[in-house]
Amino acid sequence: MAGARFGIVFLPESLADFGALCRDAEATGFDWLGVADSQSVFHELYVALTLAALQTSRIRLGPLVTNPQTRHLVVTASAIASLDELSGGRAALGLGSGDSAIYTLGAPPATLAGLEEAIDTLGSLTSGEAVKRAGRTWQVHRARRRVPIYLAAEGPRTLELAGRMADGVIVGLGLTPEVIALSLAAIERGARAAGRTLADLDVWWFAKTNLADTRAAAIDHIKMALAASANHAFRFTLEGKGVAAELHEPIRALQRAYDAHHHEIAGAGNAGLTDRFGLTEFLVDRFAIAGTPADCVAQIRRAMAAGARQFVITGFVPDPRAFMKRWTHEVAAVL
């Protein structure tokens, strides 16, 4: 995959064939295999990641993404340290404020201060260090290596936090040249505040993805994923995120209608929201790499010209194994 690197994230909908899916991800050249964390909607994150570790030998593995709200930090540190040992040092921890995992429980998203504390605490715990929190001493005695932490970020303040504290960033604000510039500037501000540079961070860009013989068919299968992006990336504020004023109310209407229990489920109610509120084309341009192979190549080249180089794409499609093979031969090989 010369010129660009790709990771892929899966929804653990079935465990029976998950190992084969992971083997194919590695065999087709992906550099990162992520698993979504949504305990009420999909199978358990770390069970799926254990399968992935046992069925692969090269590819990076980890949650894309977990959160500090539904799992105690010591539990997460123990889980990711165990995965790191099992996989021979291939684990990476994707961390965010929470989405369907928290909303299906009625829990609040992590605050910026909570994310900052989580990054600091998880880094220490996975290094095997003792940490004092809330009058207690926490430690993961079998942890041996500081597992790299990647912060999933959409807003300027979270992007700055990533630049200041994280090992890497998973940018979820979009893929247009304007949004890429805005995001990189925020990450760089945070990096400078910590005496670092943008080059010190491993930056990845999240893309809702599909390939088909026609652009319309590709988009149709990922409308639930586009709705999820609108619901998540703009949930706290639309300010400072490069969204035209006339789109604010349609986005808020979509968010009011969004059902966390149907998060990322094809054919469920959320899939109809992008058309219902007239947002499909905006969301495709903003968040997607989707269409024919030529469409996808053009979208990636546009993003690369703006400064993006590494992309986490979604395998939220009817046949992810066929999708990966086609992606490798008809998109990645062309770049």
Residue ranges and their predicted role:
Residues 14-25, 76-79, 153-161, 222, ...:
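Short, acidic/polar
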Residues 4-16, 66-73, 143-154, 209-212, ...:
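Active-site mouth loops of central-metabolism enzymes
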Residues 4-10, 33-35, 60-64, 91-95, ...:
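Hydrophobic faces of well-ordered beta-strands that scaffold small-molecule active sites
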Residues 1-64, 147:
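N-terminal beta1-alpha1-beta2 module of alpha/beta enzyme domains
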Residues 29, 52, 83, 122, ...:
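Conserved, mostly hydrophobic/aromatic
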Residues 2, 108-140, 180-181, 185, ...:
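An alpha-helical appendage that flanks or caps ligand/catalytic pockets
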Residues 46-66, 70, 125, 193, ...:
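Alpha-helix-loop-beta-strand connector modules within alpha/beta enzyme cores
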Residues 22-27, 49-60, 80-91, 163, ...:
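Acidic (Asp/Glu)-rich catalytic clusters
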